[in-house]
């Protein structure tokens, strides 16, 4: 997840306040990415750390940047795909799956989901 200081998604109702952190949003996105066919791992967003990580519980936020705008959410995903899959179809499926999961869980519109293919795994 991005190291940027981002404001949590906050909603105020007569019963109280609901605050969802960018890390929680990244967790929802990570779970959706894990369910996507053809994705075998996440890659760090920065180029300093070029080691690709296979999706594991402790690394699930790696390769996910969450940007919370006033009335919507934008997400950047840095993924590694399986060799032999059609990149455009996998990316479109990831976009649809993540958008649906975030919208369903948060009830807030998702403005963009950007998929950055950082590598292809051949094994």
Residue ranges and their predicted role:
Residues 2-83, 87, 92, 108-123:
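Contiguous, often N-terminal, cationic amphipathic patches that form binding interfaces
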């Amino acid at each position: 997840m991005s190291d940027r200081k981002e404001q949590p998604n906050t909603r105020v109702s007569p019963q109280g306040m609901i605050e969802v952190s960018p890390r929680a949003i990244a967790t929802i996105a990570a779970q959706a990415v894990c369910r996507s066919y053809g994705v075998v791992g996440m890659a760090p967003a920065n180029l300093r750390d070029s080691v690709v990580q296979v999706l594991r519980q402790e690394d699930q936020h790696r390769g996910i940047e969450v940007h919370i705008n006033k009335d919507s959410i934008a997400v950047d995903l840095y993924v590694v795909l399986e060799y032999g899959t059609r990149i455009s179809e996998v990316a479109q499926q990831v976009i649809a799956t993540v958008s649906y999961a975030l919208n369903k869980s948060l009830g807030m519109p998702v403005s963009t989901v950007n998929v950055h293919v950082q590598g292809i795994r051949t094994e």
